[in-house]
Amino acid sequence: MSLLRYFIFFIGGCTLALASGVSYTEASVYMSGLSGNENEVPSISPSDSRLVFAHKLGVSRFHKLKSHSGARKIINEMLHSHSELSSFFYAEKSNTFLTIAGLAESELFDTLNPAFRISSCPSSNAFASLMCRYERQLDSLDNGKTTDIYLNDIGGVISIHDSTGVYSQITTTPYKSLEDYEQLFGEDKASMFDISVKQDRVFLSEIYALKILVEFLSSKSQQERSDTSIVIGQLVGLEALYEKYGKDSKIYQVARENMMTLLSMIKQVSSTYTFILLPPIDSSETSTRYHKRQVDMEAFGEEIEEVVASYEKNYNGRCYISEEACSKATNDCSGHGRCSKYGQLDSCYVCQCSNSVVSNAAGQNKTIRWAGESCSKQDISVEFQFFFWFTIIGFGLLIFSIMLLFSIGQEELANVLTSTATVIKKTT
């Protein structure tokens, strides 16, 4: 990831922050397959939300999940709603993860409740820093590469993490963005924007980038092969318009509707999505930039030391030389077990996984078995064995039934049934 991107995040965050200060309202998070109860949407801290997002992106081994964390219940619900068994038989699809600044909860997905809310919502600049941390962790896990396919000069970015694909950047000009916007939403709405104004140009370019992203995700969804790419985006154009023109301005109202339209399109073509809606910043806050910078740095807490099993193992490469090394390398067995000595071997510590019990909407308990070196994978061996042998036995019974019917059909009928002689009744 380039230094230019970090510099743009910093400058963009400063620009928006100086205009409005710090916001402490709640952010709303929408996730595919997970919807909160209308009257009981859970609210968690920014630090707990970091753990949930890390699980969603597959980098939870970098983040320590405490036993009494507010994130644990939500993660268990995610595990219950997305069956590992179904993903075993069906191809994985791309994961879309977007943060949208300047959009409130009630303005999106009327029929869908947020999965959860984030209390004391950090700024968009803090979320941008968090996304960068996730991207570094993704790259270190699979030696993949995160490519910035779109980048503007106030912190907006769209990236794709993929270990195999090569992606070109989305480039446009102010005139091209305005022309494309007019084709999408009409001439009347396009006439409200002035490409000589920086905030207008940024928003139009983000709309153009989202349109290209919709086309990209649509083509991906039609492919039958597995797709493990992850799209991570940070959109700040709407927030910039809010700061420039105000929440009651016509241009902001139109831009908000445009953003909701494109997010709904992404929702339709993306099988797995996460939308983080950051509400418009409250301009009444008077905190200084120095205070805000400190808040941004501490907003999501600290993850564990960024290593991926780089601690020393013993000579056979299967055990860790100490309990501490095992605990650090596996993030305390991903919170699903504990490190203990293996047999009678000296300097050999491995994870002993334990089961988790989650409840579904009907109040029924479900046991989740964990496996793997760091207890980070669900053990579906029992379900697989049941499905496998059920299929084999069922297929065998089907063949046996067909053969039995075929053999019966080849036998000659008895003489009584095949006789054509007419029975004549005698009279006396």
Curated annotation (Swiss-Prot):
Q: Name one Pfam family in it.
A: DUF6859
Chain coiled-coil ranges: none
Cellular compartments annotated: Endoplasmic reticulum membrane
Q: Does the keyword Amino-acid biosynthesis apply?
A: no
Topology: which residues are Lumenal?
A: 20-385
Principal place where this protein is found?
endoplasmic reticulum
Membrane topology (Cytoplasmic): 407-428
This protein's membrane topology, according to the annotation, is: Single-pass membrane protein
Assigned GO CC terms: endoplasmic reticulum; endoplasmic reticulum membrane
Give the keywords, sorted. Answer: Endoplasmic reticulum, Membrane, Signal, Transmembrane, Transmembrane helix
Entry-linked InterPro entries: Archenteron_Induction-Rel (IPR053065), Vps3844_C (IPR024382), Vps3844_N (IPR049205)
Q: Name one GO biological process term.
A: vesicle-mediated transport
UniProt keyword RNA-binding present: no
Source domain of life is Eukaryota
Protein name from the UniProt record: Uncharacterized endoplasmic reticulum membrane protein C1709.03
Q: Which organism is it from?
A: Schizosaccharomyces pombe (strain 972 / ATCC 24843) (Fission yeast)
